[in-house]
């Protein structure tokens, strides 16, 4: 089994992605972390130029992945533009399963809904979603929520 964890490398999102990597590796599941990075680093500018954003290292094929997990911070009540561009640029996804997660300190807004909508336009199968909310840094106790999220969807992969 092959898993791709694609995430915007900011704060708690990175910690959650790395936690997924640990969990999968302990279960002897192949996992690859993919930080979603665009040439434009300034998030405010990303919102203004989303349609023109270019990924630094686009993925050509996702056929080898049984599951793709996509993570974003919640900024301005939605997913970051770089993640949206990543989803839009994905090749055919009908044979892949997806899980989505978002992190934020307040209301979840439309982050998961936005990512789900972009994936549904590609006929993707989303098996689970989760918003991790905390005003504090994720510690081992908070990361147990990540483990619980994994447990929810592990039988579907």
List PLM regions with ranges:
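N-terminal beta1-alpha1-beta2 submodule of the flavodoxin-like/Rossmannoid cofactor-binding fold
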Residues: 1-71, 77-89, 150-157
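Structured loop/turn residues at beta-strand edges in well-structured enzyme cores
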Residues: 63, 93, 124
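Short, conserved loop/helix-junction motifs that constitute active-site signature segments
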Residues: 89-95
């Amino acid at each position: 089994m092959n898993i791709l964890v694609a995430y915007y490398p900011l704060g708690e999102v990175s910690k959650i992605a790395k936690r997924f990597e640990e969990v999968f590796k302990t279960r002897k599941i192949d996992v690859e972390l993919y930080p979603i990075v665009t040439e434009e680093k300034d998030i405010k500018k990303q919102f203004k130029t989303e349609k023109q954003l270019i990924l630094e290292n686009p993925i050509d094929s996702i056929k080898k992945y049984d599951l793709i997990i996509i993570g974003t911070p919640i900024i301005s009540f939605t997913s970051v533009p770089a993640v949206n561009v990543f989803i839009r640029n994905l090749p055919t996804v009908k044979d892949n399963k997806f899980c989505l997660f978002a992190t934020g300190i307040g209301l979840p807004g439309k982050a998961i809904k936005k990512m789900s909508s972009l994936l549904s336009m590609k006929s993707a199968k989303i098996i689970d979603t989760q918003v991790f909310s905390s005003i504090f840094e994720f510690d081992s106790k908070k990361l147990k929520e990540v483990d619980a999220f994994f447990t929810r969807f592990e039988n579907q992969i």
